[in-house]
Amino acid sequence: MEFSTKALDLSKAGQNGFLATKTDCLVVGLFEGQSLAGVAKALDVATKGLVARLVKQGDFEGKRGTQLMLHEVAGVGAARVLLVGLGKEADFNDKAFAEAVRTATRALGGTRAASALWCLVQQPPQQRDVAWAIITTITLVREAGYRLLERHPELKRAPRGAGANEKASLRKIVLAVDVGDAKAASQAAVRGTAIANGMELTRDLGNLPSNICTPTYLANTARGIAKRHKLKVEILGRKQIEALNMGAFLAVTKGSVEPPQFIVLRYDGASAKQAPVVLVGKGITFDTGGISLKPGEGMDEMKYDMCGAASVLGTIQAVAEMGLKQNVIAVVPTCENMPSGIATKPGDVVTSMSGQTIEILNTDAEGRLILCDALTYVERFKPAAVIDVATLTGACIIALGHVNSGLYARSDALADQLLGAGRKAMDTAWRLPLDDDYQDQLKSNFADMANIGGRPAGSVTAACFLARYTEKYDWAHLDIAGTAWKSGAAKGATGRPVPLLTQFLMDRAA
């Protein structure tokens, strides 16, 4: 879908102004119980009081979540006019704005409209600007229009006659802004499109079946990103991983015939003097649990155990598309976790790249094993900050459900930056404790530590395990087990936390 911006002069709204624009649909927002203003007022004047009459007669009151589609309206160039309720202006917050965007998108999806002049972004919530409104609009509209089978048609044979009676899909949206916002709006459209592209890549990688999206597939995806955006890429295979003494990572790979990959993708957007932000993504392309085998029911969803990897690849692609003035490195350890005659067994002791030994009490706590070696590896970059992203624990889902990602950080400053970015991007996280007292649960009689700490505070002890490998830099951990994908009728990857991560990086580059 193509997005562009157009500056409006409300003083020229009539026959020769923006309302004369030829388009399939004009989208206009109305507040509940307010006098008409802005575009709504201009539309009312051009249509000789039509909008005011609709409000007065009770046909459309501007209530939140409502819409009214009008056809062949005299005085405008659009084939349709869509009125969207914004609710009461005093209550118009981020969620109300998002609801208006989703309401308009659904309404347009029920028509044959292929283009729209979208006049909602001039009315951002308080504390937000037009750039925020544009980025939010683009990501939400693209999110609603995402279909894996359209992006990967090889996965399903089209039925006979497919497409003969299908409605035209929305292909072009022009986002109308005030003249004074034109420059900021243009940059925001580029950024919103980049974030949406990154989210779609992340969703694709998560949704693809594990016989397609293998560690090698992820490595080739990274190569493709590097080629398209002129990034530096390095892919390490098993022999190189062995040479680095990544014993924890290698322990997870033992049961699978799929070769492990260690991906390093580098975007140099700023001076070489700027220390990079490093994003580390867990890339378990299928997780059976290994010898500590998971129950069969729902195991198909373990293809989503690489969503951390998918999200850091989506994020660095978005950053490159934006041309952000920030150095960013994406690091992805990726493999399968499978049972076999040579797989790692409960009770085995391995030596990580850091030299610390680990008693593997549960082979289904494998994400932290591949991450700990990656977190040791990234010390060489002398990073400004490291953020690891992982579908790490079911315990995080029990704690936070499917609304907030779990956030752990030693530094209050880094935690606050990530939490603020999440709120702004409507991709929220909740900070959980990282107290040293929890470390006692990881004690082992046979190694420096165990890889699990028992049932209590399972997400916390997983983060505490990772913390032992991050003492040389500023670090945060995002547990996205509850937010990376949805189950049920709407099953599929969400693209989170790409919005949070990209907003965090945009804020740092500002």
Swiss-Prot record:
Q: Which GO terms describe its biological process?
A: proteolysis
The principal localisation class reads cytoplasm
As given in the record, the signal peptide range reads none
Which keywords appear in this protein's UniProt record, sorted alphabetically? Aminopeptidase, Cytoplasm, Hydrolase, Manganese, Metal-binding, Protease
Q: How is the cofactor bound?
A: Binds 2 manganese ions per subunit.
State a single Gene Ontology molecular function. metalloaminopeptidase activity
Q: Can you say where in the cell this protein is located?
A: Cytoplasm
* UniProt binding sites for Mn(2+) 2: 282, 287, 305, 366
EC numbers listed for it are 3.4.11.1, 3.4.11.10
Q: Which residues are annotated as active site?
A: 294, 368
Q: Where does Mn(2+) 1 bind?
A: 287, 364, 366
Q: Which cofactor does it need?
A: Mn(2+)
The record ties this protein, via CDD domains, to: Peptidase_M17
Q: Which reaction does it catalyse?
A: Release of an N-terminal amino acid, Xaa-|-Yaa-, in which Xaa is preferably Leu, but may be other amino acids including Pro although not Arg or Lys, and Yaa may be Pro. Amino acid amides and methyl esters are also readily hydrolyzed, but rates on arylamides are exceedingly low; Release of an N-terminal amino acid, preferentially leucine, but not glutamic or aspartic acids
**Does the record's keyword annotation contain Lipid metabolism?**
no
Q: Can you cite an annotated GO cellular component?
A: cytoplasm
Which family does this protein fall into? Belongs to the peptidase M17 family.
So what does this one do? Answer: Presumably involved in the processing and regular turnover of intracellular proteins. Catalyzes the removal of unsubstituted N-terminal amino acids from various peptides.
Specify the protein name.
Probable cytosol aminopeptidase
